[in-house]
Amino acid sequence: MGENVDAARVRDCLAGDPQAFAALVQQYEKPVYNVALRMLRNPEDARDIAQSVFLKAWQNLSSYDPKYKFYSWIYRMAINESLNILRSHGRDAEPVDERLPAEDAGPADVLAAGQGREAVLAAVGRLKPEHRSVIVLHYFVDLPYEDIADVLDVDAKTVKSRLYSARQVLKDQLAARGVT
């Protein structure tokens, strides 16, 4: 969906059209759930995050700035809510049943579909949250650096640096487990 369509839907929501918000939820519910699932590796927590994100989006829609992409705003909420869950539970992530694929497979799912799929997904789950978020947004959501920077509210150079560091950690973790 284009930025202009999303901005128009937000305007319609603010003008009192509940169907416009329903269209935004329909457009973004799977991507938001998938971001939370990749961050938390727990389907129940991911569903809770998705519900929480859309409730907060509805409550704070008037604070959305249309000069930014709507998906950046909603993904930022999903990442922040996921990080809050990780902090509050004092854990990195719980194992997810790998037989349950995400709703929309991304490039990292294709990459990890071979023999080392479980090892790759487990290694992503062990990353520090700031590294996990850039890996999830770049490889699983397929966002470019600039959009990841918008979502995480950091500079694009920071995204590139975190992505480089995350790749190095993943490479080391996988090599230690004999996955190449």
Across the structure, where does each feature detected by a protein language model lie?
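Amphipathic, Lys/Arg- and hydrophobic-enriched alpha-helical face
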Residues: 25-43, 60, 124, 169, ...
